[in-house]
Amino acid sequence: MNEKNIKHSQNFITSKHNIDKIMTNIRLNEHDNIFEIGSGKGHFTLELVKRCNFVTAIEIDHKLCKTTENKLVDHDNFQVLNKDILQFKFPKNQSYKIYGNIPYNISTDIIRKIVFDSIANEIYLIVEYGFAKRLLNTKRSLALLLMAEVDISILSMVPREYFHPKPKVNSSLIRLSRKKSRISHKDKQKYNYFVMKWVNKEYKKIFTKNQFNNSLKHAGIDDLNNISFEQFLSLFNSYKLFNK
């Protein structure tokens, strides 16, 4: 993702009143280390450094890096890295959380990056409301892949009036809470394959007719358009048994 395209997709929240309202839904304490995705003009960064042990802001726009550094000149518990989040290597040997008001047009890429390439125990993101709903939709491949690794919650609405420039749609604050992976390391490739075939309704490529009917019955599924993640895991476990 080049710098020009990312800058054109950025919408900033600058009102301290609105930022404080959002922050009430984010669990932070003075011991937390935070990686912030996109410092923007430093308005959220400033509130994060007041609440946390240390903040590392990752910002691709060189000018915004300087703006953030100038805004936080009275604080020393932060650093701003002029880097592309999609190329950033998160540490593997420390505890941290992630926060970001992320660009709509690369939300999928960013969320894949931070769930699968970081060990953050909690992730807070401001995303487009429709995107947030899709993350809870078990008919979507991204939702099924994420739900195996994190619990996903929509914490609050973020009205489009909070942003400058004002986008066409409302946003949501979401939380992704890390959990023990529901898929063993040796089964991850098999799970990815199963997810893609299921979402594309290529049932014949993963089950025979009898296997399919028995798997649905075992999972307690009456409606293919309305299944829970636990029911989906039951289907995957049946698939594994049939393909030992």
Curated annotation (Swiss-Prot):
Keywords on record: Antibiotic resistance, Methyltransferase, Plasmid, RNA-binding, S-adenosyl-L-methionine, Transferase
Signal sequence extent: none
Protein's UniProt keywords contain S-adenosyl-L-methionine: yes
Gene Ontology MF term list: 23S rRNA (adenine(2085)-N(6))-dimethyltransferase activity; RNA binding; rRNA (adenine-N6,N6-)-dimethyltransferase activity
Enzyme kind, highest EC tier: transferase
The protein's Enzyme Commission number: 2.1.1.184
Upregulating conditions: By erythromycin.
One of the GO BP terms on file: response to antibiotic
Binding site for S-adenosyl-L-methionine: N11, I13, G38, E59, D84, N101
Catalysed reaction, written as an equation: adenosine(2085) in 23S rRNA + 2 S-adenosyl-L-methionine = N(6)-dimethyladenosine(2085) in 23S rRNA + 2 S-adenosyl-L-homocysteine + 2 H(+)
Keyword Methyltransferase carried by entry: yes
One of the record's GO cellular component terms: cytosol
Classification via InterPro entries: KsgA/Erm, rRNA_Ade_diMease-like_C, rRNA_Ade_Mease_Trfase_CS, rRNA_Ade_methylase_Trfase_N, SAM-dependent_MTases_sf
PROSITE patterns: RRNA_A_DIMETH, SAM_RNA_A_N6_MT
Gene3D superfamilies, per database record: Ribosomal RNA adenine dimethylase-like, domain 2 (1.10.8.100), Vaccinia Virus protein VP39 (3.40.50.150)
Function description: This protein produces a dimethylation of the adenine residue at position 2085 in 23S rRNA, resulting in reduced affinity between ribosomes and macrolide-lincosamide-streptogramin B antibiotics.
Protein family according to the UniProt entry: Belongs to the class I-like SAM-binding methyltransferase superfamily. rRNA adenine N(6)-methyltransferase family.
Name this polypeptide is given: rRNA adenine N-6-methyltransferase
Organism per entry: Staphylococcus aureus
Gene: ermC
